Amino acid sequence: MVRGKVQMRRIENPVHRQVTFCKRRGGLLKKARELSVLCDADVGVIIFSSQGKLHELATNGNMHNLVERYQSNVAGGQMEPGALQRQQVAEQGIFLLREEIDLLQRGLRSTYGGGAGEMTLDKLHALEKGLELWIYQIRTTKMQMMQQEIQFLRNKEGILKEANEMLQEKVKEQQKLYMSLLDLHSQQPTQPMTYGNRFFSI
């Protein structure tokens, strides 16, 4: 039986997507190590998860040295100057991102497990700025959510107020109708009832 072609598309379920990412990432890194060992090749792999977490592999040395080798090989005219400049900017961004991730990870470890004494003064200042930014973003998001909740309650209050006014108008209309019926009944003339020769008025 011929197996049908599997269509590659994004996994919608976040749990299944994360499990598949971990499995495929492990398989990719394993293949990269095997290629390096079997063929004596220098292999570098850089992966960013959907949450922005960095995963990397440099089989010989470190990723920074491998990137420098790559840049030195392509800088000899194989790439256009603009493309090379964009690549350098991207590499610099990756390097800064790695530094920021490392700094924040150290800050989290220091917050929950001690060890802040191992950080330098500059890194502590940078961590403080990062935490202040986080707190500002959290407070901003919190204020936005509170404003949305207040607006929702105001809208709900307005709807209830309108419904109450409509009910009051209906009650007034019913009262007017009832009073009109009473007036109409009171204005009707009394009709005498006879029993033999006697008259009784009602």
Swiss-Prot record:
GO biological process annotation, one example: vegetative to reproductive phase transition of meristem
Pfam families: K-box, SRF-TF
Keywords: DNA-binding, Nucleus, Transcription, Transcription regulation
InterPro entries: MADS-box/MEF2_TF, MEF2-like_N, TF_Kbox, TF_MADSbox, TF_MADSbox_sf
Residue stretches making up the K-box domain: 87-177
GO CC entries: nucleus
Cell compartment(s), UniProt: Nucleus
GO molecular function: DNA-binding transcription factor activity, RNA polymerase II-specific; protein dimerization activity; RNA polymerase II cis-regulatory region sequence-specific DNA binding
Record domain MADS-box: where: 1-61
Organism superkingdom: Eukaryota
Classification via PROSITE patterns: K_BOX, MADS_BOX_1, MADS_BOX_2
Signal peptide (UniProt feature, chain positions): none
CDD domains reported in the protein's UniProt record: MADS_MEF2_like
Tissue: Expressed in seedling roots.
PANTHER family registered for this protein in UniProt: SERUM RESPONSE FACTOR HOMOLOG (PTHR48019)
Task of the protein: Probable transcription factor.
Protein name (database record): MADS-box transcription factor 33
Source organism (scientific name): Oryza sativa subsp. japonica
